[in-house]
């Protein structure tokens, strides 16, 4: 079995799922994708993308928490997760979560109906955010692919700052951000994703993930960038590493 995230939850990169699935099938291997981040946000065709199994979650598409969906291609045999009753085709015994099932079904239907319009708006907001940040804040890098990324994701690294301090100041300005995934909230270690793609610890420590919504406005994006510029300048002003860097640049 090969299992690959459809899109990364931190840096937003969309993986070449169809190509990976073809490689798996060419070698007689089943292919599963964790599509939690992508489901309801970008088009997914399990046939064209050579997907045998796919998992998704309700809360990522404004559905209920605690409910998910698992697609299994007809003919693929898997072991039961919970033995006992015959619920869910004998794959998971136990009483059905009817409110959750109805909720995720409705959320998926609504997400599909307005996906194109919603994604277009989020992409416009995302690209405006990325363009301004990279243009107006020096010594900054965008993490993840520039275009093959989730419509609502932007992830940056700012050199010479510490991410936790940046998040505190952003929070004081009324801006929600993170320096990793929700799964690792509370950890002061740099993102394992950023380390895995080759970033050194000192740069990975200055990461910021911003997740957008169709309900955000251009005014809010501009406010975020304006506040972020002040915060980065303030933190770098207190950084001995940045001071040493500037001195070397001026020699």
Where are these regions (language model features)?
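Pyridoxal 5′-phosphate
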Residues: 1-251
């Amino acid at each position: 079995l090969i299992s690959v995230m459809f899109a990364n939850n931190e840096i937003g990169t969309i993986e070449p799922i169809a190509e990976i699935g073809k490689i798996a099938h060419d070698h007689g291997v089943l292919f599963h994708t964790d599509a939690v981040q992508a489901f309801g946000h970008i088009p997914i065709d399990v046939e064209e993308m050579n997907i045998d199994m796919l998992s998704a979650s309700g809360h990522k598409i404004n559905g209920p928490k605690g409910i998910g969906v698992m697609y299994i291609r007809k003919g693929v045999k898997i072991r039961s997760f919970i033995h006992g009753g015959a619920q869910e085709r004998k794959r998971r015994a136990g009483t059905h979560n009817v409110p959750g099932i109805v909720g995720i079904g409705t959320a998926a239907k609504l997400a599909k109906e307005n996906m194109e319009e919603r994604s277009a708006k989020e992409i416009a907001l995302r690209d405006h955010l990325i363009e301004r940040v990279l243009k107006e804040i020096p010594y900054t890098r965008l993490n993840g692919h520039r275009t093959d990324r989730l419509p609502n994701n932007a992830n940056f690294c700012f050199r010479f700052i510490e991410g936790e301090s940046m998040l505190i100041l952003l929070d004081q300005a009324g801006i929600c951000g993170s320096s990793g995934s929700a799964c690792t909230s509370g950890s002061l270690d740099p993102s394992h994703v950023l380390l895995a793609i080759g970033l050194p610890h000192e740069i990975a420590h200055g990461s910021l993930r911003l997740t957008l919504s169709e309900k955000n406005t251009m005014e809010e994006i501009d406010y975020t960038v304006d506040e972020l510029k002040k915060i980065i300048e303030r933190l770098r002003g207190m950084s001995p590493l940045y001071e040493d860097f500037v001195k070397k640049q001026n020699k």
